[in-house]
Curated annotation (Swiss-Prot), chain A:
Name this polypeptide is given: Protein LST4
Keyword Transport: yes
One Pfam family, short name: Longin_2
Family (UniProt): Belongs to the LST4 family.
Limits of the uDENN FNIP1/2-type domain: 114-302
dDENN FNIP1/2-type domain residues: 718-825
Lineage of origin: Eukaryota, Fungi, Dikarya, Ascomycota, Saccharomycotina
Compositionally biased intervals (Low complexity): 543-562
Transmembrane segments: none
Species assigned in the record: Saccharomyces cerevisiae (strain ATCC 204508 / S288c)
From Swiss-Prot, chain B:
A Gene Ontology cellular-component term: vacuolar membrane
Highest taxon of source: Eukaryota
GO biological process: cellular response to amino acid stimulus; positive regulation of TORC1 signaling
InterPro entries: FLCN/SMCR8_DENN, Folliculin, Folliculin/SMCR8_longin
Protein name per Swiss-Prot or TrEMBL: Protein LST7
More about this protein: Present with 656 molecules/cell in log phase SD medium.
Boundaries of every uDENN FLCN/SMCR8-type domain copy: 48-212
Coiled-coil positions: none
Name of the gene: LST7
Gene Ontology molecular function: any one: GTPase activator activity
C-alpha cells in the first residue's frame, strides 16, 4: 500500500508533467518563447519534479499559521516528537507585525502553493538625464503566473519607486543589493543596482517573490547572489558586445552612450535569456521553497535524559529486528558518522548523508538514530507541558511508575496490537489504511521491543495470574489465552532464528526482501539521466505511452492490498517472525473496553512542547523574558539601576547601568535549525541529511547534484546508505583542471552554464564500507570506533536490562554513554 | 571593537536625517574609552534629535556583559561618517515605509544594514507624525558572512526590534490618551493616523519634541541602551562559538 500511495503520487505528478510538457511543446512554435503560459508550464514541471508538495492545493489564509507541510501527514505524533521536537511544525512564518497595524496591509496570502510558484524578473535601466520625464526603460519583464495575481498587476512604474528609491542619488557609484517588502502587497523585492563603466546610467536587476519566503532569503543568499552575479555578467556581456560592434562598424564615438535600452535583448540573445530564467526556476526558487517548506530535524540537547532514553531504545529495537547478532550494520554506520562524517558535514557544506529505502518508517527511524550523532545540537531548555492526571487513573499511574519498561506484561502489548488492527480494519480508504498502518507500526515498535526481549524466556505465569486477579471480568480471561499463545509462538520463532547460527539463514531471510522492496518502489527506474530535463521528458513519455497498462497494474496492486493485509505487510518488513493476529482476537477486544484505556504506552517525549516552524525555533518566549528582565517596562523609576561615573578631559560623565543578564539569557539557544530532514519523496540537493526512495533514479539524482555542487567547489563527498541492499558507500567526487586554463571572455561570462566547454575532469571514487552483508576494508581508527560503538551499545543494553539499578543512576549512566559517543575523538 | 552597531535614527522636520543614539561594543576587558564622547552643549541640538539622559551631566551610557563594554552615545566619533551615510541613504535615497517591516541593503561602503522604520503620531510635527528607524549595521565588506549572521538570528533580531518598537508605541499611546480627555476622539485620531498621506505639509507652528516627552518615560533611552546591548551581545556571541 505504501507503494500504491507513492505510485499514486508519481502517477499524478507524471500526468501533470506530461500534460504541461505537451502544452509547452505545442505553444512554442506559435508564440514567443517567453510567453507566460508556456513558462508557467515549465515552472510547474520543474518544481513538481523537484519538490514533493501537492500541486494546486488551495489553502485558506486563516490556516496559514497552523498549516503543516503535507509531507507530515503520514507521520505519527510520536515520530514528530522524536524527529522535530514538536507535534506542530507550520511553514516558515512571515512577519506578522504588519497585521498588528490597523488598516495597513489589508492584502492577505490566498494560496500558499500558487504564490510560491510565481516570481517576476525586472531589468530596468535608468538614464542619467535627470530632466527627462521618462528616464526609466524596461529592459526585461518576465512573470511566471498562469493565473492573474497581485505580482503581475503591479506596474513597473510603481515598482521603480522601490527599486531605485527617490530621485536623490548618492555621489558614489557603488554596486548595491537590496531586500525589501512592498507595502500593501505580499511581495518581497530583491534588487541589485550596478553601473556600467562608470557611466551615469544605472541598471537594476529585480526579483519579486512572495513574502512568505522572506525569512529564508538571508539563508539562501549565496544562491540568490550567484544568480544576480550571473545575470549581471550577462548584461555586461551584452553591453560589451554592442560596444565592440559599434567600434567595428565605425559608428562609435566618444560621445555616444552604450545603453541596454538600445538593445532588444529578447530578440538578439534568446539563449542567454533562457539560461538566466531557467537557472532561477530550477535552482534558486526550488531552494527557497525547500528551505521554507521542508521541516528540519530538531537535535535534542545531549543532557535531555528523556531523549537519550528514547534514542537508546530505538537502537536496541533496530539491532534486535534489523541487524541481528552477526551483522554490524548499525554500529559501523554510526562509527562512520562519529569518526568521519560528523566533521565532514560541518566543514563541507556540499557533503551529504542519504538513506535510500522504500520504507518510509524504517528510514525515518534510522534518521532519528543518526541525527543524534550530528551537530549543532540545541542547548536551551526544553519546555515540558504538564499532564493532567485524573483521580481515577492516578492509582494506575502510580503502579506503572514502579514498573520498568522491561517488565511490561505481554498481555497489554498484545491487546494494543489487536486494538490497532481493529482500528485499521474499520477504515475503507486504502490511503487511510496506509496511515493507520504506519501509526500502528510506530506505536507498536517500542512495546514490541520488550515483548521480543521477553522472548528469551517462557512467559512468566505469575504475571498472567496477576492480570487475572486484577480483573473480575470473565471475558478478560478469554483475552489472555490467545495472547499467551501468540507470545509463545513468536518466542519459538525467534528461538528458532537464533539457534540456527549459520550465515545462510540470514542470507535466506534476505532473499525474501527484494519481493517486498519491489512492491514499495515508488517510480520506474531509469538507466541513464544526463540532466533533469531529460528525466522529465523520459518520465512523461513513459507515462504517456503506457498509461493504460500502468493503470491496470495500479488496479491489480490495489486489489491485492486488502485492508487486512496492509498492516501485515508493514509489520512483516520489520518483524518477519511475527504472525498476523487472527480475527478471534479482534472479537475479544470488543469485550474488554476498560482495559484499553489503562494500557496506553507512556512515551517519554510525549509532553515535549517546542515552538518552531519548518526552519527555525521561535524566539518569542526568550525575547519576552529578556525584555521584562532587562528593560523593566513596569518599573517607572530606574534610578536604582545605574550610577554616574565622573568624566575626565577626554570624555564626559558616564551613566553606567547594571548588567541584568544572567546565565539563562547569556547564551542564546540555537534558532536556525541545521539542514537535516526526514524521508522525502525525491532527493533534495539542499539538505545534508535526508532519506529518499531507493532506486536508480535517486542515485542518478544524487550523482548529478554532486556534479552541480562542483561548479562552485573542487571536492564533495556523500555517504549513501541503501537499506534494501544493505550498502554503505562513501562517494567522493573531485574536479581537476586539465590543459589550458585561459578562457575567452564569452566562456567566462557563461561559466556556470556551459560546463562542457570547461577543460577539467571529474574523478569519482567510491569506497564500499559495507556491502552484501560484508564489512569492507576499514582503517584502524574506524575499526577502533566501531568497537567503541559496539561496547557502548552493549553497556547501555546491560544498563536497561538490569532491573535492580536505580532509575536516577541508570539515567546518569545513559547520559554518560551517550555523551561519550557524541564527543568521541580518534585520539581517545 | 566589533563590527556590529545598532542605531536609532530620526528624520527631523528641520534637520533631516539624524542619529539619536548609537550602541557599540569595545574590546573585551577594556573600559571602551575610545567610544566615549566628551561633553557637548545640548542646546545646539533640537529637542527632536537629542538623546536625553536622565542625568544631565552624562553624555555616554555603558554596561558590561561578560566583561565586554557596550556603550551608547548620541553620536559615534569613530563611525560618524559611516552612520551619516547610512541614514541619508535610508531616509532620503530609498523609499522608506514606516510599517515595522525590514529593509536590507548592502554595499561596500556602508556594509550590511537592516532598517526597520516606525512612526509616532504627534500633532506638533509636520504631517502629524514623527519618523524613526532602528538600524542594525554590520560594518563589513563580506556580504556572505553578514548575511549568514543575519540568517542565524533572523527571528531574534526582527523580534527584538519589534519588542522595543511595540513598547515605544504603547507608552506613546498611553501618554497621548492620558493627555487628552476625550478617549473616543483620541482613539479615532490614532486610527486615522494610518491613512495620513506621505506628504509633510509645512507649518511653522510645529515644534520638535523628544522621544522622552512623547512617551513620558524619563528612562526610555536607558532601556533602549540596555536592550540594544543585549541584542548586540547575543548576535556577536554566537559568531564566536565555532
Amino acid at each position: 500500500m505504501l507503494g500504491n500511495l507513492l505510485r499514486n503520487k508519481t502517477s499524478s505528478s507524471g500526468f501533470e508533467k506530461s500534460s504541461e510538457h505537451s502544452d509547452f511543446s505545442s505553444v512554442v512554435p506559435n508564440v514567443p518563447v517567453y510567453c507566460k503560459a508556456a513558462s508557467t508550464g515549465t515552472t510547474k514541471t520543474a518544481a513538481g519534479a523537484l519538490l514533493d508538495t501537492a500541486v494546486n492545493v488551495e489553502k485558506p489564509s486563516e490556516m496559514l499559521s497552523t498549516t503543516s507541510p503535507p509531507i507530515l501527514d503520514h507521520i505519527s505524533d510520536d515520530l514528530k516528537l522524536k524527529l522535530f521536537g514538536s507535534r506542530d511544525i507550520p511553514y516558515s512564518r512571515p512577519i506578522d507585525t504588519l497585521q498588528n497595524n490597523g488598516g495597513l496591509g489589508t492584502d492577505k496570502i490566498t494560496s500558499i502553493n500558487e504564490k510560491t510558484y510565481a516570481f517576476r524578473i525586472l531589468i530596468i535601466e535608468e538614464a542619467g538625464q535627470m530632466a527627462c520625464r521618462n528616464n526609466y526603460r524596461d529592459i526585461f519583464d518576465y512573470t511566471t503566473s498562469k493565473i492573474s495575481n497581485s505580482m503581475e498587476q503591479i506596474r513597473p512604474s510603481e515598482l521603480k519607486e522601490y527599486i531605485f528609491g527617490s530621485p536623490v542619488r548618492s555621489s558614489d557609484l557603488t554596486q548595491c543589493d537590496k531586500i525589501r517588502t512592498i507595502p500593501n502587497s505580499d511581495l518581497v523585492l530583491i534588487t541589485r543596482i550596478f553601473y556600467y563603466t562608470h557611466q551615469y546610467n544605472r541598471i537594476a536587476i529585480s526579483l519579486c517573490i512572495p513574502r512568505i519566503l522572506l525569512p529564508v532569503v538571508a539563508e539562501s543568499w549565496s544562491s540568490i547572489s550567484s544568480w544576480l552575479t550571473q545575470t549581471q555578467k550577462m548584461l555586461i556581456g551584452f553591453l560589451t558586445k554592442n560596444r565592440i560592434m559599434q567600434e567595428n562598424t565605425g559608428n562609435y564615438s566618444n560621445n555616444s552612450v552604450i545603453k541596454l535600452s538600445n538593445i532588444d535583448i529578447r530578440t538578439h540573445y534568446p539563449k542567454e535569456i533562457e539560461i538566466m530564467v531557467q537557472t532561477l526556476q530550477k535552482r534558486v526558487i526550488p531552494g527557497l521553497r525547500s528551505m521554507s517548506e521542508i521541516p528540519r530535524l530538531f537535535l535534542y540537547p545531549e543532557t535531555f535524559k528523556e531523549f537519550v532514553h528514547v534514542w537508546f531504545k530505538s537502537i536496541f529495537n533496530w539491532i534486535e529486528i534489523k541487524d541481528g547478532p552477526k551483522l554490524g550494520f548499525l554500529p559501523l554506520l554510526m562509527a562512520m558518522i562519529i569518526s568521519d562524517y560528523r566533521h565532514t558535514i560541518r566543514e563541507l557544506k556540499t557533503s551529504k548523508i542519504v538513506i535510500l529505502s522504500g520504507n518510509m518508517v524504517v528510514a525515518n527511524k534510522l534518521l532519528f538514530i543518526l541525527s543524534a550523532l550530528l551537530e549543532p545540537k540545541y542547548k536551551g531548555q526544553i519546555t515540558i507541558r504538564r499532564e493532567n492526571i485524573r483521580s481515577d487513573s492516578s492509582a494506575v499511574s502510580r503502579n506503572k511508575s514502579n514498573n520498568n519498561f522491561v517488565d511490561k506484561p505481554e498481555t497489554e502489548l498484545s491487546t494494543l496490537t489487536s486494538t490497532d488492527n481493529l482500528l485499521s480494519r474499520t477504515e475503507n480508504n486504502s490511503n487511510h489504511n496506509y496511515n493507520n498502518s504506519n501509526v500502528s507500526s510506530n506505536s507498536i515498535g517500542s512495546p514490541n521491543f520488550h515483548s521480543l526481549r521477553k522472548g528469551w524466556q517462557i512467559p512468566n505465569r505469575r504475571n498472567s495470574n496477576t492480570s487475572v486477579s486484577v480483573s473480575s471480568s470473565e471475558s478478560l480471561a478469554e483475552v489472555i489465552q490467545p495472547s499467551s499463545f501468540k507470545s509463545g509462538s513468536s518466542s519459538l520463532h525467534y528461538l528458532s532464528s537464533s539457534i540456527s547460527s549459520q550465515p545462510g539463514s540470514y542470507g535466506s531471510w534476505f532473499n525474501k526482501r527484494p519481493t517486498i522492496s519491489q512492491f514499495f518502489q515508488p517510480s520506474p527506474s531509469l538507466k541513464h539521466n544526463e540532466s533533469w530535463e531529460r528525466l522529465q521528458t523520459t518520465a512523461g513519455n513513459m507515462q504517456r505511452t503506457s498509461s493504460s497498462s500502468s493503470l491496470q497494474q495500479a488496479t491489480s496492486r490495489l486489489s491485492l492490498t486488502t485492508p487486512q493485509q496492509s498492516p501485515s505487510i508493514s509489520e512483516y518488513d520489520e518483524y518477519p517472525w511475527m504472525g498476523t493476529p487472527g480475527s478471534p482476537n479482534v472479537g475479544d477486544v470488543s469485550h474488554a473496553p476498560p482495559l484499553v484505556k489503562n494500557i496506553s504506552y507512556k512515551f517519554p517525549l510525549k509532553n515535549v512542547e517546542l515552538k518552531r516552524d519548518c526552519q527555525r525555533i521561535s524566539q518569542d518566549d526568550l525575547l519576552d523574558e529578556a525584555f521584562e528582565r532587562i528593560c523593566q517596562p513596569s518599573l517607572a523609576d530606574l534610578n536604582s539601576t545605574y550610577e554616574i561615573f565622573p568624566g575626565n578631559s577626554s570624555y564626559a560623565d558616564i551613566l553606567t547601568t547594571d548588567s541584568d543578564i544572567d546565565d539563562g539569557l547569556m547564551n542564546k539557544p540555537l534558532e536556525l535549525l541545521p539542514k537535516y530532514t526526514m524521508y522525502l519523496t525525491h532527493f533534495n540537493n539542499f539538505f545534508q541529511l535526508q532519506a529518499c526512495p531507493a532506486g536508480q533514479e535517486s542515485e542518478s539524482r544524487i550523482t548529478n547534484s554532486m556534479k552541480i555542487d562542483l561548479l562552485k567547489a573542487d571536492y564533495t563527498r556523500s555517504l549513501l546508505v541503501s537499506l534494501r541492499s544493505r550498502d554503505i558507500r562513501d562517494v567522493a567526487l573531485k574536479r581537476e583542471f586539465t590543459g589550458n586554463n585561459n578562457n575567452n571572455s564569452n566562456q567566462n561570462i557563461y561559466d556556470e552554464n556551459f560546463v562542457g566547454k570547461r577543460k577539467y575532469v571529474l574523478k569519482q571514487k567510491t569506497r564500499k564500507i559495507f556491502s552484501c552483508g560484508k564489512i569492507g576494508k576499514l582503517s584502524t581508527s574506524l575499526e577502533n570506533c566501531v568497537n567503541f560503538v559496539e561496547n557502548s551499545i552493549k553497556s547501555a543494553m546491560m544498563l536497561y536490562d538490569d532491573n535492580g539499578i536505580d532509575s536516577e543512576l541508570r539515567d546518569s549512566e545513559a547520559l554518560r554513554i551517550f555523551s561519550s559517543l557524541v564527543h568521541y575523538c580518534n585520539a581517545g | 571593537m566589533s563590527s556590529t552597531v545598532i542605531s536609532l535614527a530620526h528624520f527631523c522636520d528641520k534637520h533631516g536625517p539624524r542619529i539619536i543614539s548609537v550602541t557599540q561594543s569595545a574590546e573585551k576587558g577594556t573600559l571602551g574609552e575610545e567610544l566615549l564622547v566628551p561633553d557637548y552643549p545640548t542646546e545646539s541640538y533640537c529637542e527632536s534629535c537629542l538623546l536625553q539622559f536622565p542625568e544631565e551631566s552624562t553624555r555616554s551610557m555603558r554596561c558590561f556583559i561578560e566583561d565586554v563594554p557596550f556603550i551608547t552615545t548620541q553620536y559615534s566619533s569613530i563611525r560618524y561618517q559611516l552612520l551619516n551615510s547610512i541614514i541619508k541613504r535610508a531616509f532620503s535615497e530609498e523609499t522608506m515605509i514606516y510599517d515595522n517591516m525590514p529593509f536590507i541593503f548592502f554595499d561596500d561602503l556602508r556594509g550590511l544594514n537592516l532598517v526597520i522604520g516606525f512612526k509616532l503620531y504627534d500633532e506638533n510635527a509636520r504631517g502629524n507624525e514623527r519618523r524613526y528607524c532602528f538600524i542594525l549595521t554590520v560594518d563589513s565588506r563580506s556580504h556572505d558572512d553578514s548575511m549568514k549572521m543575519l540568517s542565524e538570528h533572523w527571528n531574534f533580531i526582527i523580534g527584538g526590534f519589534d519588542k522595543m518598537i511595540a513598547y515605544i508605541k504603547n507608552i506613546h499611546k498611553s501618554e497621548f490618551l492620558g493627555k487628552n480627555k476625550t478617549v473616543e476622539n483620541n482613539l479615532e485620531t490614532l486610527n486615522n493616523n494610518a491613512f495620513i498621506g506621505s506628504y509633510l505639509r509645512a507649518n511653522k507652528s510645529k515644534f520638535g519634541r523628544n522621544l522622552v516627552s512623547l512617551t513620558d518615560d524619563k528612562f526610555l533611552f536607558v532601556r533602549i541602551h540596555k536592550w540594544n546591548s543585549f541584542l548586540l551581545h547575543t548576535v556577536m556571541n554566537e559568531n564566536k562559538l565555532p
